[in-house]
Amino acid sequence: MWTTDDEVRFFNDAIRLNSIENLMVAVRNRYYAFQPKEFNETVVTPQARNGVIGNATEKWCKDFFFDIARQNNLYAVNGVICRSIGLTPQTPADLAFCTTNNKEQSAENIKLIFEIKMGIVNNYLYTEQEEFSFCGDYTTHKGNPSLLRSDSMLKAIGKSVNLRVDSLAGKKIPIIILGNSPITRGYKDKVDCLCQSGVIQKFVSLYPNPTIREHIKQSPKNGFETFENERKVAEYIAHILGSEMNYFSAMMHNNQLGKLIDIASREDNDELKGQKFIELLKQI
C-alpha cells in the first residue's frame, strides 16, 4: 500500500534527473512539496513535476498490481491502446488487466481498466543536508492532491464516460479510478451516483493512513473506498473480474420500459433474462 516511504523514494529518484526548482515550490528561501497553510506567499507550483509524478505513480501501480493480475491469469499493462473503444496513443489507459502483455490490445483482451489519479499527498521540506523530510500530512498544506483535486476527478469521470459511449465493446469493461487520498465531502454523493449508474465501478484509495485527523474513508454507498491492505484489494479485484457485467443507459417512457421487461422476463433463467434485456436496449 502507499506510504510516505514511496513519496520520499520518488523525490530521491526524481532529483537525479530534475532540478529542485522543477520538483518543489520555493517559500521563504526553502523548498517544500507544497506551500504550508501558515504561509501566504505567492508561489508557483512547478508544472514540470506533474509528468514526472504521473509516470512514477503509473509504474508504482503496475508493480503493485502485478501479482494480483497474475493470480487472475492476466497481465498488468501500462499505456494500453485500443482504438475501437477510444483508447488512442494520446489517451491510453493508464493501466489495464489484459490477456496478453502488449500495449496494443483488442477490446476482447482488456478485462479491467484503471485510471490513475495519484500523486504526492504529504508535505516535505528539502533540508540543508539535501534530504526530503516529512513536515506534515495533506491537511497541513495548500495543495489538493490526488482525488481531492476537482479537475482530477472531472478528468477521470470524463474519460470513463467516453469509454462507455465510444462503442458497445467498451460497455463490458469495468473501470476503477485509483487514488491515494480521501475525497472531498462535495463528491461523496457524486461518486456513489456514478458507481450506481455503472459508469465507474469504484473510486479507490490505496493510502490507508493519509492523516490521523477525521477524513472520508468511504462514501455512504461505497462508491469510494479506502482499502487497508493488499489482500482486500486482491479480493475486490477478483470479485470484479468474476462478475459478468454490462453497462447500459437509456431514457424512455415507463410503458416502453415495461414492454422490454415483459419480453425479457419470458426467458428461462435470470442470466438469459439479463442478456435479452441488454439486447433489446441495443435495438432502441
Where in this protein do the model-derived segments appear?
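Interdomain/boundary linker segments immediately adjacent to catalytic/signaling cores
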Residues: M1-V80, I261, I284
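Phosphate/oxyanion-binding active-site loops and adjacent basic polyanion-contact surfaces
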Residues: I53-C61, T88, L148-M153
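A generic secondary-structure signal
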Residues: F64-I68, K159-D166, C193
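A short acidic/basic microdomain associated with nuclease active sites
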Residues: F66-N102
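Short hydrophobic-acidic sequence motifs that mark active-site Asp/Glu residues
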Residues: P92, K111-E115
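Short, solvent-exposed loop/turn segments that connect beta-strands within catalytic domains
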Residues: N101-N109
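Catalytic cores of nucleic-acid endonucleases
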Residues: I116-R185
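Non-catalytic C-terminal interaction segments of nucleic acid-processing enzymes
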Residues: A169, N180-I284
